[in-house]
Amino acid sequence: MNKFCLLPFHGKRIGVANIPFTILLKKGPYFLHSHITAVYYSTKGKNDSHEQSRVSKKSTFTPLETPWYLRIVDNEKELMEGKKNNHHTMNKELEIPKTSPNSLRKIADLLTGKLGLDDFLVFDLRKKSPNSVSAVNKLGDFMVICTARSTKHCHKSFLELNKFLKHEFCSSAYVEGNFNERQESRRKRRLARKSNLSKLLGRSSECSAKDLNSEAWYMIDCRVDGIFVNILTQRRRNELNLEELYAPENEKSKFQNIDSGNVPTISGVNEISSNNNILLGLRRLAQQRRRYSTINPNGLSNLRYFLQKEDFKGANKIIQSSSGTETHNIRTLEHVKNTLKDLVGQEKKVDVVQWKSLFDEHSTFLTINQSAAYWPLRLEYAILLNKADPQFYSDRVFLKDYLLLKKSLGQELIREDLIALLEMVLKTQHSSHSYFNLVKQNRVIIRALNLFKGLQTEDNGSVVYDEEVISLLLNSMVADERVKLRSLYETIDHIFQTFGDKLTSGMIVSILQNLAKIKDWNKLLQVWEAITPTEGEGQDKRPWNEFINVINQSGDSHVISKIVNNGHLLWIRRLNVNVTPELCNSIKALLKTAGMENSTLEEFLVRGKNNQ
């Protein structure tokens, strides 16, 4: 038998496959799959026979199975059939509120059927409880929440829904949360800059390119029957828990996160990426280290000492060193307000910027929730800041810093808030009384009035139609004799049409004073005669004393003589007006200015009344 051998090589191990039919020539035909032998040679000595190993592997022939790339099609078919069955069951179990419009059913069928959105929920916001009225109830009538599989699925669903609304209802949807390419590139640059800064500071950053577009929330106003659609990814939906926000008061407990393992801690919230997540950022601020204030009498005296010196660093140390409940924090803010009130009352110059930042720094979220005590305190503090420096803390700052803040936090605005703004507008001083400066002032008032729409007073009347509010509004329309808003006369006519015979004395006096300020005497007499009673004696309750004082203070001899000579004062006797001592003095002063002192007319109006 002839054999072919391989000489050993000095170096690394060399594995040689020794196939029997190529080595043993006398053997018969040999099948390749029956026997395979591998021989490994070593570079060590000949005696090291244990270093040589032979590995034999026997394999048996098995029938071929379906390759994995052919099984993919079958698996996808089974998956699609399962999804169709799930959608059929979901459509059967789809709950739509009773007495809902047909448009809601069509939109629901599109979202769950064609677009394949899951976990479909509808909240009926039409049933508004008077004890739980919030901004959510005023958004719309129906709030829809559904889950998408990815951000691309969210975007595609919005596009299809918008096409459907245009085709079926001729309406174009408004969306929040849809980022265009420019916004997305800007967002990526910010995240990259944040990541680089974290690396320089030795911190780990979770802002990776993979997580940039992993979550999304599309809030869509369909503009059809008050329907809003929220399309979220699963993780974002779990984070926001919008169900608890939109659910009625008696059903909120069903959607609360009871599992303590899912409730984020302070460290857990800090670890979650808060990119473009406002609600998560607010939660993080609420759970961070809070500053409480429980100050003993010695601490209060020290705090007052530092505040009077305007040593805000020392005051901050005293407040932060104490701990307690949020009620004590309210007391601390009240002490700060009282100190500022004393300084402003003494007409001392104060640093308004530092005083405002001190109050804001210690206004935590839990403190703000105590609305019964916090918001009146903040209103009084804002009025003091405006009184100390009207140029810095102007009416525009008050609109954003107080009114918009209070409204955005779900608190109800009241009559005193609007009055405070109007008084600030009237106190604002401009370098010149021009028409354009007056228009700028009233733009602030218009923005504020939009916030008070639908709000009522204790008498179930609109806040805008309050007597003091109307007087301040009319005063804000007139700067001097030459500068006034063109809408002044329209406002006066609207007040007459709205109230009619129910005009109060305060409203009449305000109208007369503003017309006298611009010296429109014809309109003034027209208004005065328009409210003359016609039902008989004893019915004239017009403010005669204020009317005569307005005429007398004008100093216009032509107007005064016209009032006296045309017999306007005779209506005092004709309508049996109650002549008070104040009215007697006003009549005497007016007749003295007209040169008719101790005249027959004076005796008829004043002395004749006293003789009766």
UniProtKB/Swiss-Prot annotation:
Tell me the InterPro entries matching this sequence: Atp25, ATP25_mRNA_stabil_dom, NT_sf
Entry's localization field: Mitochondrion inner membrane
For this protein, the parts annotated as crossing the membrane are none
User: What is the recorded name of this protein?
Assistant: ATPase synthesis protein 25, mitochondrial
Task: Give the signal peptide, or none.
Answer: none
Which family would the database say this protein is a member of? Belongs to the ATP25 family.
Organism listed in the record: Saccharomyces cerevisiae (strain YJM789) (Baker's yeast)
Give the membrane topology, semicolon-separated if more than one.
Peripheral membrane protein
Instruction: Return any one Pfam family short name.
Output: mRNA_stabil
Domain of life from the UniProt record = Eukaryota
Main subcellular localisation: mitochondrion
Sorted UniProt keywords? Membrane, Mitochondrion, Mitochondrion inner membrane, Transit peptide
Q: Give a short account of what the protein does.
A: mRNA stabilization factor specific for the 0.95 kb OLI1 mRNA. Also involved in OLI1 ring formation.
SUPFAM superfamilies membership:
Nucleotidyltransferase (SSF81301)
Q: Name one GO cellular component term.
A: mitochondrial inner membrane
GO BP terms: namely: mitochondrial gene expression; mRNA stabilization
Which residues belong to the transit peptide?
1-14
